Amino acid sequence: MKLVFATNNQHKLDEVRKITAGYAEIISLSDIDCHDDIPETADTLEGNALLKARYIKEKFGYDCFADDTGLEVEVLNNAPGVYSARYAGTEHDSEANMNKLLSEMNHKENRKARFRTVIALVLDGKEYTFDGIVNGSITTEKRGDSGFGYDPIFMPDTYTQTFAEMGNDTKNQISHRAKAVMKLTSFLSDYNC
């Protein structure tokens, strides 16, 4: 089975391809010659994921899945949430986003946070959603060099390393995206039977 993954983020694409190996052939947006800036105008993770998956299905005709991920910090009323990628005002500026969040968390005792990913799948005319959550906390400083986004400041519960310190192999087994993708692959495995 071939599915388009509606992302331009090479890190996400690589992570998802590793997890779905053997379940589906994942095709990128560039593979279908899509260079569109797909709108993410919904106010929920589910809404944004569905917007992207529907866009590809309607415009290009491919079965597709898309994701949206948010970092939800308890003491900040679950911000940055759906606005995680543009929290500091500039789209996809991870350093600025982390710096803003660390500044807002300065002197906060409650550092509980969670990463949440929602995957929306449009397949054979039907829509499905799958979610994955990792609970953890925000560190007081950036730690580690691997990963992307907020990985250097997010430490999952029961671990002493941030996502950026633990390396991709470990992260790909426990991450929010991995959990959502595992639900997707389980669904596809049953669907293909």
From Swiss-Prot:
<dbReference type="GO" id="GO:0035870">
    <property type="term" value="F:dITP diphosphatase activity"/>
</dbReference>
<comment type="function">
    <text>Pyrophosphatase that catalyzes the hydrolysis of nucleoside triphosphates to their monophosphate derivatives, with a high preference for the non-canonical purine nucleotides XTP (xanthosine triphosphate), dITP (deoxyinosine triphosphate) and ITP. Seems to function as a house-cleaning enzyme that removes non-canonical purine nucleotides from the nucleotide pool, thus preventing their incorporation into DNA/RNA and avoiding chromosomal lesions.</text>
</comment>
<feature type="binding site">
    <location>
        <begin position="7"/>
        <end position="12"/>
    </location>
    <ligand>
        <name>substrate</name>
    </ligand>
</feature>
<dbReference type="InterPro" id="IPR020922">
    <property type="entry name" value="dITP/XTP_pyrophosphatase"/>
</dbReference>
<keyword id="KW-0378">Hydrolase</keyword>
<dbReference type="GO" id="GO:0000166">
    <property type="term" value="F:nucleotide binding"/>
</dbReference>
<dbReference type="GO" id="GO:0046872">
    <property type="term" value="F:metal ion binding"/>
</dbReference>
<feature type="binding site">
    <location>
        <begin position="148"/>
        <end position="151"/>
    </location>
    <ligand>
        <name>substrate</name>
    </ligand>
</feature>
<keyword id="KW-0547">Nucleotide-binding</keyword>
<dbReference type="GO" id="GO:0036222">
    <property type="term" value="F:XTP diphosphatase activity"/>
</dbReference>
<dbReference type="GO" id="GO:0017111">
    <property type="term" value="F:ribonucleoside triphosphate phosphatase activity"/>
</dbReference>
<comment type="subunit">
    <text>Homodimer.</text>
</comment>
<feature type="binding site">
    <location>
        <position position="69"/>
    </location>
    <ligand>
        <name>substrate</name>
    </ligand>
</feature>
<dbReference type="InterPro" id="IPR002637">
    <property type="entry name" value="RdgB/HAM1"/>
</dbReference>
<feature type="binding site">
    <location>
        <position position="68"/>
    </location>
    <ligand>
        <name>Mg(2+)</name>
    </ligand>
</feature>
<protein>
    <recommendedName>
        <fullName>dITP/XTP pyrophosphatase</fullName>
        <ecNumber>3.6.1.66</ecNumber>
    </recommendedName>
</protein>
<dbReference type="Pfam" id="PF01725">
    <property type="entry name" value="Ham1p_like"/>
</dbReference>
<keyword id="KW-0460">Magnesium</keyword>
<keyword id="KW-0546">Nucleotide metabolism</keyword>
<dbReference type="GO" id="GO:0009117">
    <property type="term" value="P:nucleotide metabolic process"/>
</dbReference>
<dbReference type="InterPro" id="IPR029001">
    <property type="entry name" value="ITPase-like_fam"/>
</dbReference>
<feature type="binding site">
    <location>
        <position position="171"/>
    </location>
    <ligand>
        <name>substrate</name>
    </ligand>
</feature>
<dbReference type="GO" id="GO:0005829">
    <property type="term" value="C:cytosol"/>
</dbReference>
<feature type="binding site">
    <location>
        <begin position="176"/>
        <end position="177"/>
    </location>
    <ligand>
        <name>substrate</name>
    </ligand>
</feature>
<comment type="similarity">
    <text>Belongs to the HAM1 NTPase family.</text>
</comment>
<keyword id="KW-0479">Metal-binding</keyword>
<dbReference type="GO" id="GO:0009146">
    <property type="term" value="P:purine nucleoside triphosphate catabolic process"/>
</dbReference>
<dbReference type="GO" id="GO:0036220">
    <property type="term" value="F:ITP diphosphatase activity"/>
</dbReference>
<feature type="active site" description="Proton acceptor">
    <location>
        <position position="68"/>
    </location>
</feature>
